[in-house]
Every structure is written in C-alpha cells, then in structure tokens.
Design a protein with these regions (language model features):
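Patatin-like phospholipase
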Residues: 1-250
Length: 250
C-alpha cells in the first residue's frame, strides 16, 4: 500500500530530534494536520481535552508528536498510511494532511491566531526560454506539472473564497454605516455572517510560495535528503519568504 513507510521518520523524531514528544508538554500550541484514511474527515492532532469528531473533522488527542508527523507526511502512493492506536486499542490509519483540504489555515484562526502565515512549495512551471517546454522533459515532468496545477487551483480557490467573504463583510458593514441604518441590525447581520461562514474579521493571512520564475524549485527533488539539494530548496524558500513579507511591510 506504499513504496515506503514513515516509521523510520517517527523513530528518528522520537529518539533524536524532539526533546518533548507530547503535545501537552509544549509551551506553545501545536496542531498537525492529517487525513483519516477510512473516512472523509480531516484529522487535527493536538492537545485537546478529549478526542471528538464532527462530520468533516476529527480532533485527535491520543497521538504523540512524532506519530502525528509520521501520519501527516505519509504521502500516497510513495508512503503507506500510518497507523496510530486509539486509547481503546483500535488502530486508526491516517495519511497526508493536504489530501482532504489544502492549507487548513482555519485551524490557526480557530485557535486564536490574528496573523496566519501559510507556506507551501507548490508552483506550476511557467515557460522560460532558457528551460523551454516541459514536453521535452518526459512523463515525470508533465505529471508533476498536472499535479501542481490541480493543487494550485485548490489553493487559489481557497484564497479567493477568503477574499470574497472579506469583501462582502466589509461592504455590508460600510453600507450600514453610510446609510446610518440601525446599529443593532448591522451587528446582528455581521454576526450571522461570521457564524455561517466561520469568518474572523480580525485575522490576516500571508501566503508564501515560490515565484513563477523559480523554475529550479519545480525541478528540485523534494524527496531528496542530499544536503546540497536541501540547501538549494531552503535558499529558494527563504528568498520567496523575504519577497512576500516585504510586500506586507513585515
């Protein structure tokens, strides 16, 4: 059910990388996103008072940090789904958190963040003369481009949806004030909008991703552990972050 597993990653994090391996031991809140294999729910691992679930979400409090990371990074079909035992002894399987829902910025906002910085590496290739057309690079490059285009569409739709809600909310707020309509009706209508679409007007979002001209990122081996490859990816990410943060005066 996968070419590899993330069990070695879990062991490395548990034995060598993490000084604390339980969510409740941390001084800050940490949430790790996965996808429930045998359901359609998104899984949110964290320090919750109890595990609970809704129609679309499963809040998991019985996983260690290393187990949650191993589950979240199990990207099919390269990595097999990762099993975590519940307190009742039932093994629940999870895989990559991006499968069910891209970015999941609502998790930070739902837990009190007023600035959410979301970083992702997906950037479809844009034609450049020095590289040429992707058809010259064979099936792997074409498949990668197709996958990136699908994911980018989901991300752009998510960002556009957030922007549309913000614009509608601000337009209604401004109209009521401009027309000097009753304050209690304005507040009530805005409260209904916030509740129905889970909108938080005091939360700002910053999205960091490679720029279209960063074709090196597209061709980089994201699964490589080679130090030079990793250093190159980190440098591209750092430059992308600086470029985006400067646009937001951060």
């Amino acid at each position: 059910n996968g070419l590899f597993t993330t069990r070695a990653l879990e062991k490395y994090l548990r034995n060598y990388a993490l000084s604390h391996n339980e969510f409740q031991q941390l001084g800050a809140e940490l949430f790790i996103i996965g996808t429930q294999l045998n359901h359609t729910r998104k899984a949110i691992f964290g320090n919750f008072p109890e595990s609970r679930k809704t129609q679309y979400l499963k809040f998991v409090n019985y996983a260690s940090i290393s187990e949650a990371v191993a589950a979240s990074t199990s990207l099919p079909p390269v990595f097999a789904p990762y099993g975590i035992k519940s307190p009742k002894g039932k093994e629940m399987f999870f895989f990559d958190g991006e499968i069910r829902d891209t970015l999941s910025t609502h998790v930070a906002a739902d837990h009190g963040a007023d600035l959410v910085i979301s970083s992702y590496s997906i950037q479809p290739y844009h034609y450049t003369p020095e590289i040429g057309s992707l058809h010259q690079f064979g099936i792997p490059a074409i498949l990668n481009q197709a996958l990136y285009q699908v994911i980018e569409q989901k991300i752009n739709r998510h960002i556009s949806h957030q922007g549309d809600i913000r614009a509608i909310y601000q337009s209604i707020d401004g109209y009521f004030k401009q027309q000097k309509l009753p304050e209690e009706h304005r507040e009530r209508l805005l409260a209904i909008i916030r509740e129905r679409v889970n909108y938080k007007p005091n939360v700002d979002y910053v999205y960091i991703h490679p720029r279209p001209q960063n074709h090196e990122m597209f061709f980089a081996d994201h699964f490589s552990l080679n130090s030079q490859v990793l250093e190159h990816i980190v440098r591209i990410g750092f430059k992308s972050a600086i470029h985006t943060l400067r646009q937001h005066d951060l």
